[in-house]
Swiss-Prot record:
It catalyses: 5-[(5-phospho-1-deoxy-D-ribulos-1-ylimino)methylamino]-1-(5-phospho-beta-D-ribosyl)imidazole-4-carboxamide + L-glutamine = D-erythro-1-(imidazol-4-yl)glycerol 3-phosphate + 5-amino-1-(5-phospho-beta-D-ribosyl)imidazole-4-carboxamide + L-glutamate + H(+); L-glutamine + H2O = L-glutamate + NH4(+). This is Imidazole glycerol phosphate synthase subunit HisH. The lineage of its organism: Bacteria, Pseudomonadati, Pseudomonadota, Betaproteobacteria, Burkholderiales. GO terms for cellular component: cytoplasm. Keywords: Amino-acid biosynthesis, Cytoplasm, Glutamine amidotransferase, Histidine biosynthesis, Hydrolase, Lyase.
Length: 213
C-alpha cells in the first residue's frame, strides 16, 4: 500500500517544488497538495511548508481552517516542517511578536550580524541566502545516508532557539552556530529547504517517507 503524504496548502510556501522533490525522492509515494482538514487527517504523513514572514504564515494557517488538523497530525503521525514551517512549530517569534503553534518549546529570533565580517572580509548579509553546511549534532533516522557537514540551501533572516538542546539535531554556522534542524518524537523540521538542496535534500525527503518514529 502506498504511503500518502499531505503537503499543507494554506496559501504560503513553495508547494509544487516540495511535491516534485518528494515524488522524485520516492516515486512510490502518493504525494498530494491538500487544503482540507479531512485530507490532512487521512494522510499517513504531513509536510508543513512555509516561506515569507511568519506573521503572514500563522495568519493564513489560522484563516485556512487547517490549523487544528495540523496540530492533531503533530500528535499522531510523522510531521515535517520546512523553513517557516519549522519556525511555526515553536511558541513565539520575534518577527512581528507572533505566537506560534507551540508544538515545540522555544522561540524564533533574528540574526544580529550588523557590522560582522566573514572570513573573506565581506559583511554578513541578512537574510542568509545560499548554501551552508549542516552539522548533525544528534543521530536521527532522517540523516540516514546524508553525509555530516553536507551543504543545504538556506533563505532566512530568523532561526529557532529550542528550549531543550536535545531537540537540536542539526547546527549551522552563520556568524555564530544556530539550530538548523530539530526533532522530537514524530516531528522533524528544517530551516533549510531540502527541495532546493540537490541529492542530500532528496535523500532527506526519502528518509521522511520511510521514517517510522
Amino acid at each position: 500500500m502506498k504511503t500518502s503524504i499531505a503537503i499543507v496548502d494554506y496559501g504560503m510556501g513553495n508547494l509544487r517544488s516540495v511535491a516534485q522533490a518528494l515524488k522524485k525522492a520516492e516515486p512510490a509515494a502518493d504525494v498530494a497538495i491538500v487544503d482540507t482538514p479531512a485530507a490532512i487527517r487521512a494522510a499517513d504523513r504531513v509536510v508543513l511548508p512555509g516561506q515569507g514572514a511568519m506573521p503572514d504564515c500563522m495568519r493564513c494557517l489560522g484563516e485556512s481552517g487547517l490549523q487544528e488538523a495540523v496540530v492533531e497530525a503533530s500528535r499522531t503521525k510523522p510531521l515535517l516542517g520546512v523553513c517557516v514551517g519549522e519556525q511555526m512549530l515553536f511558541d513565539w517569534s520575534a518577527e512581528g511578536d507572533t505566537k506560534g503553534l507551540g508544538l515545540l518549546p522555544g522561540k524564533v529570533v533574528r540574526f544580529e550580524l550588523d557590522g560582522r565580517l566573514q572570513d573573506d572580509g565581506s559583511r554578513f548579509k541578512v537574510p542568509q541566502m545560499g548554501w551552508n553546511r549542516v552539522r548533525q549534532s544528534r543521530a536521527h533516522a532522517l540523516w540516514d545516508g546524508v553525509p555530516d557537514d553536507a551543504y543545504f540551501y538556506f533563505v532566512h533572516s530568523y532561526y529557532v532557539m529550542p528550549d531543550d538542546p536535545a531537540h537540536t539535531v542539526g547546527e549551522t554556522a552563520y556568524g555564530a552556530p544556530f539550530t538548523s534542524a530539530v526533532a522530537r518524537d514524530n516531528i522533524f523540521a528544517t530551516q533549510f529547504h531540502p527541495e532546493k538542496s540537490a541529492e542530500v535534500g532528496l535523500r532527506l525527503y526519502r528518509n521522511f517517507v520511510h521514517w517510522k518514529p
